[in-house]
Amino acid sequence: MKFSPIRRSLLALVLAPALAAGFVGSALAQTTLLNVSYDPTRELYQAFNPEFAKHWKAQTGEDLVIKQSHGGAGKQARAVIDGLEADVVTLALAYDIDAIAEQTGKIPADWQKRLAHNSAPYTSTIVFLVRKGNPKGIKDWGDLVKPGVEVITPNPKTSGGARWNYLAAWGYALKQPGGNEQTAQAFVTEL
């Protein structure tokens, strides 16, 4: 089949980029992963991802690009359930992973069984930020319910970190003399 010079030029313009992309793609093996995570891990993964990419390259010979999506853990879980194509999910609570497993089937329902004691591989540290000089003398959970003290924390319905805050406050109340479910409920309600 003969093509006019104009058609040949048009075909060259259309096919050249496609062919070049195919050759470049095969020459540069690359994997891209999306890690859907919760807000406090942003800086952790900014430091971790380049080191993991080096390890991946050494193990596989492939370049690795890791993309991040951060937000409240509950909202991130909902996004995955609603179709966000995550390759890795690193959320604050097992509850969020369970919801993804139950509603999408993309994670085995018994995912925790692969770890000792059905563990979730995360910990969390609660930190109290106070005004300069700590004028109200806040040192422990009990200080947070003193008159004049206000607590600012994210919503536990959408934030895994806030759920840890809630659970830590509950645990504190349980460990107080006479602590039980009722006193813990009263404490977190007052808080």
Where are these regions (language model features)?
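Sec/Tat signal peptide C-region and signal peptidase I cleavage site
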Residues: 23-29
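N-terminal segment of the mature folded domain
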Residues: 30-159, 177
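Ligand-binding pocket segment of bilobal, Venus flytrap-like solute-binding proteins
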Residues: 176-191
